[in-house]
Amino acid sequence: EIKSGIDFVLDCVDFDQRVKSADLVIVGEGRMDSQSLSGKAPVGVARRTPSAIPVIAICGSLKDDLPDFPVAGISAAFPIIGQVLELDQVLATAKENLYRTGLNIGNLIKLSKTL
């Protein structure tokens, strides 16, 4: 039997059973672009996530060739890079950028519960 890589991995970790109790699924991608919609891991995870559970993506950068979200089962995408930087600067600040993005997403979730 031939399976896609993401389906193999999700089966190995019993994803379908584990995701049932999730309130939110967060996927990651280095750079999200139109090619990401053609079978890369984030879309594979979104495809296997029940439709009642939102999926968001955290990515290094978002390319402008993507359609507006939601798309391919992903409700929203958040790039961690807020400005144009040289690669060495991006890599040097990755931890801080990821932390800041996660904090902003957490704040957005808290805010949504008060609306």
Model-based region annotation:
Residues 1-115:
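N-terminal loops that bind phosphate or other acidic moieties
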